[in-house]
Amino acid sequence: MSAFTDSVEKVAAALENNSKKFEELDSVAGDGDLGITAGNIAKGLRAGAAGATGDLKADLMLIGREIAKFAPSTFGTLFATGFIRASAAVADGDALKNTQLAVTAAFDGIAARGKAALGERTLLDALHPASVALNGATDLQSGLNAAATGARAGVTATASMAP
């Protein structure tokens, strides 16, 4: 398993492990099916990772397409869009720069597709601080750590946002 596919597996596991919490949160203002969608996204992530070749651009595109296939809901489509846009942004070269480009493109793609903005209690509120932290990094590992910290802070901040 490569570092990339290992990371994809961690995201898939986190989605599955938190599916009940997603259902609870979604049932407050929605139909409560976000946990099911999270599980379906995890299946798409794993299917894409299983076909990964080591070509970042192709692997991100494959994962996006697999998510779209397994989770054809609104949230699944947004998640897939993030990967597909990330795929379009990366190029040959530096891993840190490609990761920065990918996360920024994912944010922009999700915002455009979902017609959402910061402060609306969406995925963007976690992705934006992650992107900012990552874009300020000088090496990949510290950038990923900072991005994870930023994402957690963004998630926590949504609790105090008006619905």
Question: Can you annotate each of these PLM segments?
Answer:
Residues 1-163:
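N-terminal loops that bind phosphate or other acidic moieties
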